[in-house]
Structure formats: C-alpha cells, structure tokens
Curated annotation (Swiss-Prot):
The lineage of its organism: Bacteria, Bacillati, Cyanobacteriota, Cyanophyceae, Gloeobacterales. It comes from the Bacteria. Coiled coil: none annotated. HAMAP family: Ribosomal_bS21 (MF_00358). This is Small ribosomal subunit protein bS21A.
Length: 59
C-alpha cells in the first residue's frame, strides 16, 4: 500500500503528485490492469520473457 504523509506547509497538489509517483514506482496500477482478466500460463510466460528481453538486451 502506497502512503504519503502530507507536511504542514505542503500543498495538496504536491502531495497528490508524490502519491501518484509512489504508486507508479510500486507498479500498483500495472498489477491491477494485469488482474482484470485471467492470464493463462502461456501468456504469463510470454509476458515475462518479453520483460526479460527488455531488461537484458542482447549485445
């Protein structure tokens, strides 16, 4: 769960911006989108292989 503490002199807009950034870094929305529909084991393997290729490109 992403949490952001708002400082006394901090505006709501900047706190909201920080919250959105922490949610994006945690990957919460991406995970929710993945769980919208059932993903077969083959699709899961394919998605992980593509992510692995992106992370470690061939030289």
């Amino acid at each position: 769960m992403a949490q952001v503490r708002v400082g006394q002199d901090e505006s709501i807009e900047s706190a909201l911006r920080r919250f959105k950034r922490t949610v994006a870094k945690a990957g919460i929305l991406a995970e929710a989108k993945r769980h919208r529909h059932f993903e077969t084991p083959i699709e899961k393997r394919r998605r992980k292989a593509i992510a692995r290729r992106r992370r470690y490109p061939r030289r």
